[in-house]
């Protein structure tokens, strides 16, 4: 039988306006902490830090 996937779907929220703009995959084995990426926020209109939400 196949193993359960280590990848989970997460949502990314803008740290400035708190909108949840992006969803992506994350490997829980390799990235145990919260994921942080600088991405474009359409609400703010510029690139901001997006953090993984629970």
Swiss-Prot record:
The keyword Metal-binding does not apply. It comes from the Bacteria. One of its GO terms (cellular component) is cytoplasm. The keyword Ribonucleoprotein applies. One of its GO terms (molecular function) is structural constituent of ribosome. Transmembrane segments: none annotated. It holds the Pfam family Ribosomal_L33. One of its GO terms (biological process) is translation. InterPro entries: Ribosomal_bL33 (IPR001705), Ribosomal_bL33_CS (IPR018264), Ribosomal_bL33_sf (IPR038584), Ribosomal_zn-bd (IPR011332). Keywords: Ribonucleoprotein, Ribosomal protein. Belongs to the bacterial ribosomal protein bL33 family. This is Large ribosomal subunit protein bL33. It comes from Symbiobacterium thermophilum (strain DSM 24528 / JCM 14929 / IAM 14863 / T).
């Amino acid at each position: 039988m196949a193993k359960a996937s280590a990848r989970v779907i997460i949502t990314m929220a803008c740290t400035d306006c708190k909108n949840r703009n992006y969803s992506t995959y994350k490997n829980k084995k390799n990235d145990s902490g919260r994921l942080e990426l600088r991405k474009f926020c359409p609400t703010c209109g510029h690139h901001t830090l997006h953090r993984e939400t629970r």
